[in-house]
A protein has these predicted regions:
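N-terminal hydrophobic or amphipathic segments with adjacent small-residue motifs
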Residues: 8, 19-25, 63, 158
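N-terminal leader/signal peptides at the extreme start of proteins
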Residues: 1-15
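N-terminal pilin/flagellin-like segments and related low-complexity appendage regions
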Residues: 47-245
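N-terminal single-pass transmembrane signal-anchor helix
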Residues: 12-41, 54
């Protein structure tokens, strides 16, 4: 009986301060291990969502092309493309905090809203009077958001990725099934054929790296920046999310 009472007293005394501190320490260690894992998983989920959105943009542009036998560009972009080496045009370079050069020889800089209003059949901008989409077909189904900083298509009609970066979109405006992008055509970025690009001998080197696709879509990714003086496989460019890779 004495043994039983002693055992009961031991079971009922609760945790000591030292035991509580040990438990708290273990919880802290587990939390410190869990937070980075959750952060990494969240980042990967956003990257996956961005790739899905890029695929949606490319598909919408291709469907538009199939219907109209042209790309959904504004007249200003089409005119600028003629003067660009390679004859292509990059949307999405306007209003960026990171300097992304327009194509050499191009006199026009635009964000991707010009494409979005055409693809979504919105009666504004270059699509006023539905001039560029007379069938008023909604080719793109994307999330509309209030404001101009959230992921999705904002009130300015700019399409931003899950990291809140505007998508940069290059089109094969001369219909040769090869596309030059204002950023990725640069020798400093793509030398060696990084991201599956090749040097197009039809355009004089340097800065003649191109993709064998009619549409290139990309964004800055998690770090929200890119550097035209650094290679594509190093920071800050290595986390850029691209559609053609």
């Amino acid at each position: 009986m004495k043994t039983t009472r002693a055992s009961n007293r031991h079971m009922g005394r609760g945790f000591t301060l030292i035991e509580l501190l040990v438990v708290i320490g273990i919880i802290g260690i587990l939390a410190s291990m869990l937070v980075p894992a959750l952060s990494h998983a969240k980042k990967k989920a956003k990257e996956g969502a961005a790739r899905t959105e890029q695929s949606g943009i490319s598909g919408a542009i291709q469907t538009y092309y199939n219907d109209y036998s042209r790309f959904p560009s504004s007249p200003s972009a089409a005119t600028a493309a003629v003067a660009n080496p390679g004859g292509d045009f990059t949307y999405g370079t306007a209003g960026l905090t990171t300097a992304v050069p327009v194509l050499t020889g191009g006199a026009y800089d635009a964000n991707n809203s010009e494409l979005m209003v055409i693809l979504m059949a919105v009666n504004v901008g270059p699509n006023a009077g539905h001039a560029r989409n007379p069938k008023q077909t909604p080719y793109l189904n994307a999330k509309l958001v209030s404001g101009t900083t959230e992921p999705g298509i904002g009130t300015d009609y700019v399409y931003r990725d899950p990291f809140r970066n505007p998508y940069i979109i290059s089109l094969d405006m001369n219909f040769d099934n090869v596309t030059f992008d204002a950023f990725y055509r640069q020798n400093a970025v793509s030398t060696g054929g990084l991201n599956g690009l090749f040097q197009n001998a039809a355009v004089a080197a340097p800065n003649n790296w191109a993709a064998r696709t009619p549409v290139m879509v990309w964004s800055f990714g998690f770090d929200n920046t890119a550097d035209v003086t650094r290679r594509a496989n190093v920071d800050p460019n290595v986390d850029n999310i691209v559609s053609w890779k």
